[in-house]
């Protein structure tokens, strides 16, 4: 049986400093109210020591001004870490994908750029393989309880439902889907289990559940409904929570997960 994966998320914004703009690790609540909590590279090293299976690095600014900072941050991480890195934020072109892979990314995370230009998924998958392509899908629960896809940091609604967009991504060669509940993000109330439970029957792709973890049991619940991995940012920013402790709880629940290097 394939082992479940535990993935800390490293989301950063840009902060001015006397030495110039620098990346600052932040946590969010429902994709808003960013709170700075440290340095992304330093935190990545801590997560590696705590047995993270992978790391997701995301530039929340996603602009042409922040792009060089994302590349520099990625270079610093890849030079000092052995943990696989999935990287995204503002990717709109194949050239940007190439730059990230050249700097040490193992996978690229496509979001708004893929919705606006779905052919980008085909191009990256055909060039580098499906295993390189993670599609990040941000969703909100609508009044009729359906889930719809939002882009631009959760500020723009699209015409895509979660299931129709997930199927389109799968048909184009995506290798994995990162599903984030905007409603649950940073609340600690638990994952959107219904979406993951239904989606596992819609697409034959590994699913990463994200948004809402506040207890180790929330990770267990995500795995039990079909997630191959659970990603979290705010949860691991708490002093009494880390990937090593969390995976022990997951193993005690009877789920297969790595416990040592």
Swiss-Prot record:
GO terms for molecular function: imidazoleglycerol-phosphate synthase activity; lyase activity. Keywords: Amino-acid biosynthesis, Cytoplasm, Histidine biosynthesis, Lyase. GO terms for cellular component: cytoplasm. Its EC number is 4.3.2.10. Pathway: Amino-acid biosynthesis; L-histidine biosynthesis; L-histidine from 5-phospho-alpha-D-ribose 1-diphosphate: step 5/9. InterPro entries: Aldolase_TIM, His_biosynth, HisF, IGPS_HisA/HisF, RibuloseP-bd_barrel. It catalyses: 5-[(5-phospho-1-deoxy-D-ribulos-1-ylimino)methylamino]-1-(5-phospho-beta-D-ribosyl)imidazole-4-carboxamide + L-glutamine = D-erythro-1-(imidazol-4-yl)glycerol 3-phosphate + 5-amino-1-(5-phospho-beta-D-ribosyl)imidazole-4-carboxamide + L-glutamate + H(+). SUPFAM superfamilies: Ribulose-phoshate binding barrel. It is found in: Cytoplasm. Heterodimer of HisH and HisF. IGPS catalyzes the conversion of PRFAR and glutamine to IGP, AICAR and glutamate. The HisF subunit catalyzes the cyclization activity that produces IGP and AICAR from PRFAR using the ammonia provided by the HisH subunit. Belongs to the HisA/HisF family. This is Putative imidazole glycerol phosphate synthase subunit hisF2.
